[in-house]
Amino acid sequence: AITDHSDDNITVDYMNAVVGLEGSMNSLIPDWHYNTFVQFSRSDGDYTSDVIYDDAITPYQWFNTGSCAADADGVTDVRGVPCITPDWYNPEFLAGNISAEDQAFLFGTETGNTVYEQAQFEAFIDGPVFELPAGTVNLGLGVSFLDERINDTPAETFQIGNAWGSSSAGITKGSKETTAVFGEIAIPLLKDKPLAEAVDLSLSARWTDVDVYGSDTTYKAGLGWQI
């Protein structure tokens, strides 16, 4: 092989912080409890790739008769570096014994960066509502907020499509906010009856709004039957 210049390396710095609080609400509502937390995480990653520069190869008829040195301005079209015309068919070159000058002209190492951040808040309260013959009706209510942000910046060589054998890649940058309100109620229907030691009905609903998509409401019903 002429070269094995194709390594990739990824380095990621990650941090995550969570602060939560839970307890009893007896002073306000007897037998009710609360649970809340705030979370923040950040991922900062560099991805480094070995590249072969396209402007050192493609404009010159793919190793054929073209010559960078024949350009009127004497520099490559994209990077603007002084032209060199490697001796493509020299046995030493084909064996991978490439001079330092040719390597500097043909090869490089480029680094892109991706930063992803996430902030989340959630609060939930639950407790008894009233009594039925079969037991206590329990209710849970909660809210949630999630903010996500990403900024992916490929190396400039990839942004302008100057990596030979690779496709171009643009900057990806954006954010998304998700807000939700949810609730669930558990209703005991039967207890200690023939063929029904316990029958419980659970009902839940969740309203979710995503700023880039819109909002929707989902519902769920479940029946537990213990013989």
Model-derived regions: residue spans:
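Glycine- and other small-residue-rich loops at beta-strand/loop junctions that grip anionic moieties
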Residues: 10, 210, 224
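Transmembrane beta-strand segments that form the barrel wall of outer-membrane beta-barrel proteins
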Residues: 198-211
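Solvent-exposed loop/turn segments connecting transmembrane beta-strands
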Residues: 175, 208-217
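Beta-strand-rich binding-surface signature
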Residues: 138, 180-182, 200-202
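Feature captures outer-membrane beta-barrel proteins of Gram-negative bacteria and organelles
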Residues: 181-183, 187, 217-226
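Detector for outer-membrane/organellar transmembrane beta-barrel domains
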Residues: 194-200, 222
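Surface-exposed, low-complexity loop segments enriched in small/polar and acidic residues
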Residues: 1-179, 192-194
